[in-house]
Amino acid sequence: MINFTMNFRRIKMNSIKMSDKRISYSGRINFDDENAPVFYYAGSSVSFRFKGTALTVKINAVIYWGELSLGAVVDGKQCSVKLSAENNGRDIDVVIAENLEDTEHNVVIYKQHAANQLLTLKGIETDGEMLDAPEKPKLKMEVYGDSVCAGEVIEAADYVGKCDPENHNSRYDNVWNSFVMQTARNIGAEIHNICQGGIALFNGTGYFHHPDYIGLESVYDKLCYFPEGGLLQWDFSRYTPDIVVIAIGQNDKHNGRTDSDDINISDPEYRKVWKTAYIKMVRDLDKKYSSPKFVLTTTILMHDADWDNAIEEIKNELNEMGIKAYHNLFTRNGAATPGHPRLAEHNEMAEELTKFIENIKD
């Protein structure tokens, strides 16, 4: 049985520092203090194995807004613990598991939410012993995306094909089963998921970080990408993906100044500006990564199909430049749901994206 609580433990526990080489990290993570790594992006994670019956992690979390949780997977079973803003800035112990069989266990601890939380891991405790770190996949994948990639409102199971529930306040968010995270697991790839709800390409557009909206053009090269956490540049030499998925275009219609979604991608002048900036970002990534394969996509969340037409044009122009770009269109692309995709819809997208990448990755 897995219990996931914040209770005080009375049994003797062995403390493990976060710098222990038996811990494996994935994601854009700040190691300025190697024993207190800071997580910014949803899906950034630690993986490790241990032999024992109980496991606790020490964390220090800051919640900026929303009803948030810490995510974990123990022996393939995903679970979450609710966090409280009352503990902001305090070190707390989170019991991940107890009463397990005294045998080998595989664990992933991950940041479940995006910029509404800052997460620091401070240590691991077990009544048993740590084992060697799991081997990392050789295949590497990176994603630049929006709320769908972040798994926002994915767990609102009663709202499949419907608008989001009112005042959900992030409590249905969980990045673990977002379609891009599922796809990475399906193809056996490590993933860096650079995703944020509401993000568009340009600063001043989209919905991220009201009222001073921040776009992917200012995020894609960041370690910490939200001002509350202290902006930091990313060192691209730390991770070189084989596959880069770019999933934006959903939020770009919002001008960031009014409540109207009045940016028209069919306007020739704006279309040229948007495409030019998109291509500039891809070309920069292509140079940094020595020619990976780029998968350009949106999602099944309803939107104007002309954004996808513009992305097709971008793909063609990139190909003419010698960049390996591919355009994915889902069966129900832009037409399946007025609200965020739920788990069943993420499963659908993951299955299709997995097949698409499998066909191009070799």
Residue ranges and their predicted role:
Residues Y278-V282, I311-E312:
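Generic structural signal for well-ordered alpha-helices
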Residues K136, R238-Y239, D286-Y289:
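Short, conserved loop/helix-junction motifs that constitute active-site signature segments
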